[in-house]
Amino acid sequence: MLKVIARRIDQFINSQSAGGVLLALSALVALVISNSPWRSYYQQFLQIPGSVKMGADWLLLSKPMLIWINDLWMAVFFFLVGLEIKRELLNGELASLKQAMLPAVAALGGMAVPALIYAAINWGEPVGLRGWGIPMATDIAFALGLLVLLGSRVPTSLKVFLTAVAIIDDLGAILVIAFFYTDNLSPTMLLAAGLGALVLLGLNRARVMAVGPYVVVGLVIWVCVLKSGIHATLAGVITALAIPLADGKGGSPLERAEHALQPWVAFLVLPVFAFANAGVSLQGVTLATLTQTVPLGIAFGLLIGKPIGVFGASWLLIRLTDAQLPDQCRWSQFFGVCVLCGVGFTMSLFIGSLAFEGADAAYEVQVKIGVLLGSLLSGAAGVALLLASRKAV
C-alpha cells in the first residue's frame, strides 16, 4: 500500500514539476510581450469577445477572452483541485488525524499570518484591504517544481509535506473565494445550483461510475453558479467532490479522472492562465510603485508571512504535542520548504483578479507586481536555504 501511495506521489510531483517549468515560461513570455512593441496585440488577444447563446434569452453569456479563461478555463483547474482534496482526505496524506495534523496546522498558520501582514500594511486603505486573501495561497506547481530540481538534496517526506500543505491551502482559498469574494447573489440561481448538487449526490448514491454524467451536471451547475454571483470556478470543486473514490472492483473513478486531467491542467490550463494574467507593463514602474501598500503587502505576506506562519505553527505543534518533523528531515531543511510556500503565483493572481474586480486598473498592475516579486524572492530564498542546509551536513 505504501509503495502504491509513494508511486502515485512521485507521478504527481513529476507532472507538477514539468508543468511548473512551462508555467514559468508562459508567465515570462507574457511579461516580455507586455513590455515590447507587441503589447497591443497581447491586449487585443485578451479582449477577443466570445458568446454562448441557447434559446431566446434562456442563456446568453458574452465575455472577453480573459474572463472566459478565468471563469471557465480555471473551473477545470478547480475540478482537479477538488479531486485531489477528496483523494487526500479519504485515501492519502490527510486520511488520518495523525497524518493530517502537521500539514493542516502548518497550512492554517501559513494562511493566517500573510493575511494579517497584508491587512496591517493596508490598514486604513478600504480598497487595498480587499486583497487580504491574495498572499494566502501556495502554487503547488511552482513550489514542487523547484523542490524536484533540487533532486536528492531534499527528502521525499518534505515533498509530500509541501504537497499536503498546498492542497489544504487550495481548500482554504476555495472557502475564501466562496465566502468573501462574492457579491450580488441571486437566490434563484443559488437554488438551481443547489438542486444540481443534489443531482450529483444522487448520481454518487446510485453508484454511477462513469465520469461523463457528473461533468454534464457540473456544466449546468457552472452556468447557475456563474449567474448566482458566486465565482463560477467553485462549480468545478462541487462536481469533483461527487466523483466516487472506488468502484467496488478495485478501480477508482476519481483517480482515473485525476490522472487523465493532470497533464491537461499542467501543460495547458495553467500555462494559458499564466500567459493571460501575468502580463504587466513595467513602463513607469518606479520604487514608489513597489512601495505602494498593495504590492508591499502581497510581497511581504508571501516572503515573510508564509514562512513565519508555516514554520511557527509547525514548531509550536511539535513542541506542544507528539507531532514530529517529516522523516529524514532537519529543521534547516524544513524552514527552507516553509519559505518555498511563499511561491503564490497562480492562486494569488486569481484571487487578486477577484479582489479588485471593478476597481481602478492600477490595482491590477500592483497585484501582479506584488505576486511576481513575492513569489520570485520566496523561490530564490527557499532554494538557497535548502542548498545551504545540504552543505552544512
Swiss-Prot record:
The UniProt keywords, alphabetically, are: Antiport, Cell inner membrane, Cell membrane, Ion transport, Membrane, Sodium, Sodium transport, Transmembrane, Transmembrane helix, Transport
Q: How does it sit in the membrane?
A: Multi-pass membrane protein
Protein family membership: Belongs to the NhaA Na(+)/H(+) (TC 2.A.33) antiporter family.
**UniProt-listed GO biological process terms:** regulation of pH
Its biological purpose = Na(+)/H(+) antiporter that extrudes sodium in exchange for external protons.
> May I have one GO cellular component term?
plasma membrane
Query: What InterPro entries does the entry give?
Result: Na/H_antiporter_dom_sf, NhaA
Record's subcellular location:
Cell inner membrane
Which protein are we looking at?
Answer: Na(+)/H(+) antiporter NhaA
Catalytic activity annotation = Na(+)(in) + 2 H(+)(out) = Na(+)(out) + 2 H(+)(in)
Q: Which GO terms describe its molecular function?
A: sodium:proton antiporter activity
- Membrane-traversing stretches: 18-38, 65-85, 101-121, 131-151, 160-180, 184-204, 210-230, 260-280, 298-318, 334-354, 369-389
